[in-house]
Amino acid sequence: ISLNSHSSSILQINKEHTDAAPSAAFVDKEKVAIRKLDSISTAFDPFKKILLKIDTQGFEKNVLAGAERLIEQKVKIIQLEMSLLPLYEGIVPFEEMVSYLNRLNFKPLFYSPGYVDRTTEQIQQLEGYFIKNK
């Protein structure tokens, strides 16, 4: 758990991130249950297409891996946060995330700036929108 809740992650936060954003500092730990989206996908209306939004502070690829059936059958658009820098331990680099989404049959729709280091003005995270190939 980070001092500011929006930086909290299952992954360990890196020093570069807390140097750029001191309010992202680690303050506590909490146990949480993790379930794959595929394990609850039957709860979704089979005739509706889904926009899947993922904002898990570096754990996005794990979420995608646990939702491959849902993604194949029902998801039309994926919106997720992608890091340009390794802000968390074990984070998947931007290029690898785009390649993974391509393998899931999704192509980039557009990107928007996410987190920007106000000191260096460097974009550290992007919000990516991907649409399923027809």
Where are the language model's segments positioned?
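Conserved acidic-Pro-Pro-aromatic motif
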Residues: I40-K134
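Glycine-rich adenosyl-binding loop in Rossmann-like folds that engage adenosine-containing cofactors
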Residues: I1-R35
